[in-house]
């Protein structure tokens, strides 16, 4: 199987969230991440640019009535970097989660550019 994209987790932001999820939710997240790896044009239902941001995307996962969001961004075109994640409980994505994701993205690029 060839991959169009590589997906990595930056620090432990995503992993700390992921490790505490039920196995069935982890499996759906893995399925969705694999879809992002192998599909050139991922349907917006699973992977969508977050309006009003520069370069921030949300990976969308639904399991039953539960909705999960994983913030991500691109580096070097085909590298998807996972940031923070949360379980969505309201219609609108909480501003504090978006702000946190933007700070993580800034931290990633500042750290990368200082090397």
Regions found by a protein language model. Name each.
Residues 1-67, 76-80, 89-115:
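Basic, Lys/Arg-enriched alpha-helical interface segments
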Residues 83:
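ATP-dependent carboxylate-activation loops
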């Amino acid at each position: 199987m060839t991959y169009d994209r590589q997906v990595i987790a930056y620090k432990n932001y995503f992993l700390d969230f992921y490790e505490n999820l039920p196995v069935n939710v982890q499996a759906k997240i893995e399925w969705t991440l694999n879809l992002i790896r192998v599909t050139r044009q991922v349907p917006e239902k699973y992977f969508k640019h977050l309006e009003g941001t520069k370069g921030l995307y949300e990976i969308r996962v639904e399991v039953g009535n539960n909705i999960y969001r994983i913030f991500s961004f691109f580096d070097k075109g085909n590298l998807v970097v996972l940031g923070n994640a949360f379980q969505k409980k309201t219609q609108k994505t909480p501003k504090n989660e978006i702000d946190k994701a933007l700070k993580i993205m800034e931290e990633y690029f500042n750290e990368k550019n200082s090397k």
